[in-house]
Amino acid sequence: MTINHLILQNLKKNLKNYYLYVFALMFSVALYFAFVTLQYDPAMDDVQEGIKGAAAMKTASVLLVVIVTTFLLYANNIFIKRRSKEIGLFQMIGMTKGKVFRILSAENLILYFGSLAGGVFIGFAISKVVTMILFKLTGLDRIATLSFSVPALVQTVIVFTLIYGLILLANYLFVKQQTILSLFHVTSSSEDRVKKVSLFDIIIGSLGIVSILVGYFVSSKLFGGTFTSMETLFIAMIFILGSVIIGTYFFYKGSVTFLFNLIRKKKNGHLAVRDVLSLSSIMFRMKSNALILTIITTISGLAIGLLSLSYISYYSAEKTAEHYVPSDFTLTDMEDAAYFKEALDAHGIAYDETVIDVLIAEVYVKDILEEPLDGVNFDSDIMILPVIRDTAVESVNVAPEEAAFTGYNDMMQQFMSLKDSGSIELRGKQKVIPQNYIGLHSEYLVSTYFSSGGLPLAIVNETTFSQLQDDINPEIQLDSSVHIGIDIKDARQLQEAVVLFHETPFTSETPQYAQVEMSQSQKQTFGLAMFIVGFLGLTFLITSGCILYFKQMDESEEEKGSYTILRKLGFTQGDLLKGIRVKQVFNFGIPLLLGLSHSYFAVKSGWFFFGNELWTPMIMVMLLYTALYSIFAILSVLYYKKVIKDAL
């Protein structure tokens, strides 16, 4: 047999056994090429407009490379260890280490760059679909075209050639460092099998569960008023991160073994074949794979969490725009409003107008704060708030000595939570007007120009408002003191009104807002974030799922002898598959459930920073991630089925 024939035979064998690796490699290349193609697409100029958009795309492409590189190196490590006996045989028949390395390199070259070419072709084919998805998410009215980008091809080839160089280096070091004898023991020694549960396992296992639960508990208190200074907040975040990650490692290192051993003891040693194939195998293997499982679980939680938060922001974009701009159009200058209304009247567009006088006042709120805010560089006892008269609000009516708040942002409430009632003071230039605070309402009545994006609006009686008008502090007043809201009666005429809004020659330097454009701006920002996070999350899901699948391939080959014995003892293929299915539920389910749990507590602790709806976006992301992740568990069961079938 010639060397070339040997290479082709090995290549054929590897392609047959490692088809999922080839698929994952092609998929990774396709994603990267499609992603880089977007950066060179002229139609993407609006999305990448500004430093932040372009930087986000470039950062995402770097993270994509890091994920793919880590996966390929880890997968290559699994495969070369699996071929250790084959490498040992090559050396036993007289091949030098250099020759063995050249054979491996030639095989990898054909397999790798063949997959690279296939991946580029797939990436080119899906690039239009990817662009369409991005345009849809960001709300851009653009036509996606199918075009081949030479710069994207060059960048992809350079990046994956460098990754190939790292793979060659890893293979070279492996072949050089191993002796012939050690090559025949690599597989058997790669996983440390535990023969019995020790006291150390019980302690580690208990610590793991407690550490995770403590991290969850602290995260639930993160923005609840327990940590009132920036220093303690930062320390708490670091503690949560460390506690959960270390707890996850200890969980795999000891908790799984400990818990499953309790189940086994409860059965008093009467284990069915299903239990032998599932519980025992998982007990002995998860401990040795604790590090990689911890990494997969942690990054899965991170990916699910980030995708949930970005989807929460995207999902809440319209509601957020309504909070910032409570009418279809808001203006802050009467003359500009007159120009705009004149244009609407000229085109027969009916509208409703709301005019609200707004003053800015210092409000002493110390007595109604739930907790004092420490560690900040401003006086938290005093808020600079917009103030309006109650006659401007149909649903609120206050007495001369009373005041109410409305439109307080959820995020601000987490940091500066208010009591239901108490005493406040409205401070003018010289006078102090004491008021009884009677509660917080949910309506948003003036634009973000007055509310600074999250501060509440104070509603007072006409008498109190007049007193403030006579004693205003000019140093804190804005350039405008009037809010004009215009709502189009017929929604079908809204787009025409937006065009007129842009054509109106506004003369004031104070801002004017269109709600629909604020919503589009929010969707464009968060749509890009969701697209990038989704892209990275999908890449990690595919690569981590493949790693778990490859581990199951190795385990199935190692346990093939056991299946042969069990088949000879009379157990059917169906009997064995019952245990295998349970095993895969645990092998894939435990990292998935832990990742989902980590992401749930992370998202729940700070979701209000990103939007005003938690459950629907988060559940949708989790269900989608679970469905895609389950595919690899199903593939593992099918592979085991093939191994069991071949066992006799």
Swiss-Prot record:
Keyword Phosphoprotein annotated: no
Subunit structure: The complex is composed of two ATP-binding proteins (BceA) and two transmembrane proteins (BceB).
PANTHER family (alphabetical): ABC TRANSPORTER PERMEASE, ABC TRANSPORTER PERMEASE-RELATED-RELATED
One GO process term, biological-process aspect: transmembrane transport
Keyword Lipoprotein on entry: no
Organism expressing this protein natively: Halalkalibacterium halodurans (strain ATCC BAA-125 / DSM 18197 / FERM 7344 / JCM 9153 / C-125) (Bacillus halodurans)
Residue stretches spanning the membrane: 18-38, 60-80, 110-130, 150-170, 199-219, 232-252, 290-310, 528-548, 590-610, 618-638
Matching Pfam families: FtsX
Family: Belongs to the ABC-4 integral membrane protein family.
Swiss-Prot/TrEMBL keywords: Antibiotic resistance, Cell membrane, Membrane, Transmembrane, Transmembrane helix, Transport
Gene that specifies this protein: bceB
InterPro entries referenced in this protein's UniProt entry, alphabetically: ABC-4_Integral_Memb_Prot, ABC3_permease_C, ABC_permease_BceB-typ
Cellular compartments annotated: Cell membrane
Role summary: Part of the ABC transporter complex BceAB (TC 3.A.1.123.5) involved in bacitracin export.
GO CC term (a single one): plasma membrane
Protein name: Bacitracin export permease protein BceB
Topology term for the membrane: Multi-pass membrane protein
Lineage: Bacteria, Bacillati, Bacillota, Bacilli, Bacillales
